[in-house]
């Protein structure tokens, strides 16, 4: 029986991790084409931290409860939903509400939990797999044998990009901020790991590619990295900007972009229409989900926290010492 109330984590007011607190909230009702999921685990992502700080508010009409990805069991169907069925174990991309015992999700944004994964492993798939697939493979068209440069290789996005890049037979170069993180990236499959604190990633990338440069660059830094990415890119290279952790503004000489015929794309995931995210989910199910069985794909989980200690999970994320994903157990 589904209760009327649930435990959820809310942001008391914008601020430090201790602004997160566990409260009682009504269990949400699924609208048409939505499902209600009893959450077993929820992934923690950088946008959650930005929302807590007050600089990345949820889209209009979305719950103020943070959390963009979950895994659990479908326990109620909205009108018009035929798949997933009641009782199905799913992971889902949500626009908010993941830090709770129950969450609603558009049915088209739900994916079955791969048979080889636990619910907590499945909970950390949606945000990074949707992001990497959409930006690296759809928008940037990474091909077999090409070189992918990934900034922040030890992050959740970065480790996912390594896994998928290698699964689709690309050469993967990453940047990371310590010898330990570089070693972890190589162990995961990265061909080259560059410690950006000890050397210039542009020079290292060109050296690793015999002067050609990277065909696709996945950048979550922004700022002055945009011009440096252009220098590290190959002719006809594609640069995908997905975050601006290093700054929102950049100054660059446009001539190298034209001479190299570069393509720069930029996107966020959360505000995209449900139809777009449903299409990405369908593409993942067709192209990536089989790889959990055939290639043994598994996400990298650094740490697990109880839902009541979401603040601890945020403190770990802000320390930048984690490798891979952080998960809340509900």
Spans of features found by a protein language model:
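Short, glycine/polar-rich helix-capping loops at beta-to-alpha or helix-loop-helix junctions
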Residues: 98-101, 176-184, 201, 249-254
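Short glycine-centered segments of the SAM/dcSAM-binding site in methyltransferase folds
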Residues: 89, 147, 171, 237-238, ...
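Short amphipathic alpha-helix with an adjacent loop that forms part of the alpha/beta core around
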Residues: 201-211
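Glycine-rich beta-strand-centered segment in the early N-terminal region that forms part
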Residues: 26-44, 55-97
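C-terminal hydrophobic helical "lid"/dimerization subdomain
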Residues: 2-4, 275-330
């Amino acid at each position: 029986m589904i209760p009327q109330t649930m435990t959820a984590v809310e942001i008391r007011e914008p601020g430090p991790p201790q602004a997160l607190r566990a409260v009682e909230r009504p269990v949400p009702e699924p609208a048409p084409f939505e499902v209600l999921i009893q959450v077993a685990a929820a992934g923690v992502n950088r946008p959650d931290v930005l929302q807590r700080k007050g600089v990345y508010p949820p889209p209009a009409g979305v719950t103020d409860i943070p959390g963009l990805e979950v895994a659990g069991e479908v326990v109620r169907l909205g009108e018009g939903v035929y798949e997933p069925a009641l009782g199905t174990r799913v992971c889902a991309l949500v626009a908010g509400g993941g830090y709770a015992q129950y969450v609603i999700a558009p049915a088209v944004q739900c994916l079955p939990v791969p048979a080889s994964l636990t619910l907590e492993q499945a909970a950390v798939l949606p945000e990074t797999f949707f992001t990497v697939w959409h930006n690296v493979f759809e928008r940037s068209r990474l091909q077999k044998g090409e070189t992918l440069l990934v900034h922040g290789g030890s992050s959740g996005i970065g480790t996912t990009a390594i896994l998928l890049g290698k699964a689709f037979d690309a050469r993967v170069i990453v940047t990371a901020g310590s010898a330990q993180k570089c070693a972890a990236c190589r162990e995961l499959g990265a061909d080259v790991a560059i410690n950006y604190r000890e050397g210039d990633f542009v020079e290292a990338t060109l050296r690793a590619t015999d002067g050609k440069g990277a065909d696709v660059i996945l950048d979550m830094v922004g700022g002055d990295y945009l011009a440096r990415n252009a220098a590290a890119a190959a002719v006809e290279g594609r640069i995908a900007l997905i975050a601006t952790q290093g700054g929102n503004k950049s100054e660059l000489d446009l001539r190298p972009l034209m001479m190299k015929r570069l393509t720069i794309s930029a996107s966020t995931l959360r505000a995209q229409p449900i139809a777009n995210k449903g299409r990405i989910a369908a593409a993942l199910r067709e192209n990536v989900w089989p790889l959990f069985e055939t290639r043994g794909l598994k996400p990298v989980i650094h740490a697990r926290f109880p839902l009541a200690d979401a603040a601890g999970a945020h403190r770990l994320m802000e320390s930048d010492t984690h490798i891979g994903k952080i998960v809340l157990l509900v």
